[in-house]
Amino acid sequence: MNREELFDVTVIGGGPAGLYSAFYSGLREMKTKIIEFQPQLGGKIHVYPEKMIWDIGGLLPVTGEKLIEQLVQQGLTFQPEVVLNTKIESIIRNKDGIFTLKTSTGEEHFSKTVIVATGSGILNPQKLSIEGAERFEVSNLNYTVKSLKRFKNKTVIISGGGNSAIDWANELEPIAKKVYLTYRKEELSGHEAQVKQLMNSSAECFFNTSITTLIAGDNHEAIEYVELTNHETGEVSQLAIDEVIINHGYERDITLLENSELDVAIIDNYYIAGNANSESSVDGLYAAGDILKHEGKLHLIAGAFQDAGNAVNKAKQFIQPDASEYGMVSSHNEVFKKRNRELIKQMMK
C-alpha cells in the first residue's frame, strides 16, 4: 500500500449524508474519498427529481434535481476523490488498524476511518412479475417518475398502495388526462393526508385488484391496454392506457455489512446500531443518514447533515486525539476567506 492510497476518511455512499460528510471532512482538513455504487452522485433523490422538498431548514422549497446539484457542488468543495460505479462488498481491518474496503471487482481501498452513508442500501425497484414485461421498459412501463411532462394529458395507471404510489397519483392527477390507481389490498397504506387527497380527487382507485396482463398495440412496442383482475370476485377487465407506473417498493442489497468481518452491531437486519454521535460498535467506523439508527434519530435529509458532522468530528479525533471536538464554523474559518472575498466581489458587480 502506497502512502498516496491511504485516506483519512472514506465515505461509502454519495447521497445527502455522504456528500455532506465529504464537505465537512474537507473542512476539517482530512484526505477524503467518496465511493458510490451508482454512476452519479445524489443518492435516492434521483428517484424523485421533480418533487419539491420543503423540510430543510433555511432552504426555500427546492426540487430534488436542484438539491442534488447543490449538494454535489458543496460536497466537492475540497476536491475529495470520487469513485463511481463501484460496489463495496466487504470491509476488513488489518493489525495496524487500517480499513480495507474490497469492491465487487477485486479492487481495494485503504482508509484510517470509514463513514457508512448508504441510506436504505442499494435499492432496486421490485419489477412487475408478468412474463415479457421488461420489453416495455423502453416505451411506457415506468418504475420511476423522472419527468412530470412525460405524463401530461396522458391516461396513466399506477400500481401500488404505499406512499410513493399515492404521492405520484396526487402529483399527476392535475397534469394527466386521467389517473387510475390499482392496489392488491382493500385499503391504501400511505400517509392519511395523502390518502384523503387522493380519495377526494378525480383519480379512480381499484382495490383488491392487480395488473395481470399487459396488452401491446399493433406495433408491439408499447402497452395499449392493461388487464385487471379483482382478487375477491375473479372479475377481469381491460383498461386503455398511455402509461403504466409500478410502485411495488424496492429490493434492498444488504451484502456490505453481511460480508464484512467486522462485528458491526445491526438493528432490524440492516441498520447500523449507533448513537447520537454517529458512532458504531466498531472504533473508527461511523454511520450517517438513514443507515444509522438510534433513539431520537431524525429521519430527514436535515438529520443526515447532523449525522455527517458528528461522524466527521469523531473521525478527526480518532485519527488525531488532541484535535478540537468540533470544526470551526464557516463564517470564521480561514479556509473560506479567499472564497468569501471572491463571492463578495461577485455580489458587488
UniProtKB/Swiss-Prot annotation:
Entry keyword Secreted: no
InterPro entries assigned to the protein according to its UniProt record, in alphabetical order: FAD/NAD-bd_sf (IPR036188), FAD/NAD-binding_dom (IPR023753), Fd--NADP_Rdtase_type_2 (IPR022890), Ferredoxin-NADP_redctase_2 (IPR050097)
Enzymatic reactions: 2 reduced [2Fe-2S]-[ferredoxin] + NADP(+) + H(+) = 2 oxidized [2Fe-2S]-[ferredoxin] + NADPH
Cofactor details (free text): Binds 1 FAD per subunit.
Cofactor(s) needed by this chain: FAD
Any one Gene Ontology molecular-function term assigned to this protein's record: flavin adenine dinucleotide binding
EC class of the enzyme, as a word: oxidoreductase
Top-level taxon: Bacteria
Residues bound to FAD: 36, 44, 48, 88, 123, 290, 331
Keyword Oxidoreductase appears in the UniProt entry: yes
Keywords: FAD, Flavoprotein, NADP, Oxidoreductase
EC number(s) given by UniProt: 1.18.1.2
HAMAP family: FENR2
PANTHER family: THIOREDOXIN REDUCTASE 1-RELATED-RELATED (PTHR48105)
Family membership: Belongs to the ferredoxin--NADP reductase type 2 family.
Subunit-structure text: Homodimer.
Name recorded for this polypeptide: Ferredoxin--NADP reductase 1
Source species: Bacillus anthracis
